[in-house]
Amino acid sequence: MLKTIQDKARHRTRPLWAWLKLLWQRIDEDNMTTLAGNLAYVSLLSLVPLVAVVFALFAAFPMFSDVSIQLRHFIFANFLPATGDVIQRYIEQFVANSNKMTAVGACGLIVTALLLMYSIDSALNTIWRSKRARPKIYSFAVYWMILTLGPLLAGASLAISAYLLSLRWASDLNTVIDNVLRIFPLLLSWISFWLLYSIVPTIRVPNRDAIVGAFVAALLFEAEKKGFALYITMFPSYQLIYGVLAVIPILFVWVYWTWCIVLLGAEITVTLGEYRKLKQAAEQEEDDEP
């Protein structure tokens, strides 16, 4: 009886172990950590231009003026570690200075923000090993859609959350709304990663694989936020060593680990489909044997 249970457990864990080996092999072959480092570098260069473009879009729509402030606080509270207040102050100063630029400088900001979109596109298609290239006009349209619709959708989601908060006066809905608001950042991350893994690759991505990969990435991202904030508050070694400049290495490390999580979610999405194909091919060979 015990031997039968052990055999069943071994039989069930064998596919998981094979999938994990395939995942590790792909991470190694794709140089995932190097890709994450490249994206982190480009992201830091594009951070101020990207934020400037996003909030310039909100300024063009007066109805989003209040949502713009909420979105700004939401981003720095949920997508940056515990030093988000300091980083927010610096970035807002940089963005205020960028608003004084000429038309040529503004075009430069937009180009820099689009270069970040291109780098993300290139990295994800490297992971998917897709050789097919999009037409340049179509790529530009996709990047511009992300830059324009992304912030507007985020603003709409914040408007919904504000509406939910306004319903808290109803005692019967208090617990439900609190639970919804508590998992709202996780849901937003999950949807964002799912859209990223579904739209950006130039080959078709199975929807269920993108959902699983995005969910794992969203969970890791939420865990990273809490773990990073805990580390900074409990072990303030960066502040002791760097003083007022501590925000710089903290931001560097945060952005790098965030891109590692994003690319790991992409690797998981790809590996799910590849493992399924390899398993089907092996079963087909067994069926073909006399």
UniProtKB/Swiss-Prot annotation:
Organism: Escherichia coli O45:K1 (strain S88 / ExPEC)
Family: Belongs to the UPF0761 family.
Alphabetically ordered keywords of this record: Cell inner membrane, Cell membrane, Membrane, Transmembrane, Transmembrane helix
Membrane topology: Multi-pass membrane protein
Location(s) in or outside the cell: Cell inner membrane
One GO cellular component term noted in the UniProt record for this chain: plasma membrane
Record bears the keyword Signal: no
Lineage: Bacteria, Pseudomonadati, Pseudomonadota, Gammaproteobacteria, Enterobacterales
Transmembrane region(s): 44-64, 104-124, 140-160, 183-203, 210-230, 244-264
UniProt name for this protein: UPF0761 membrane protein YihY
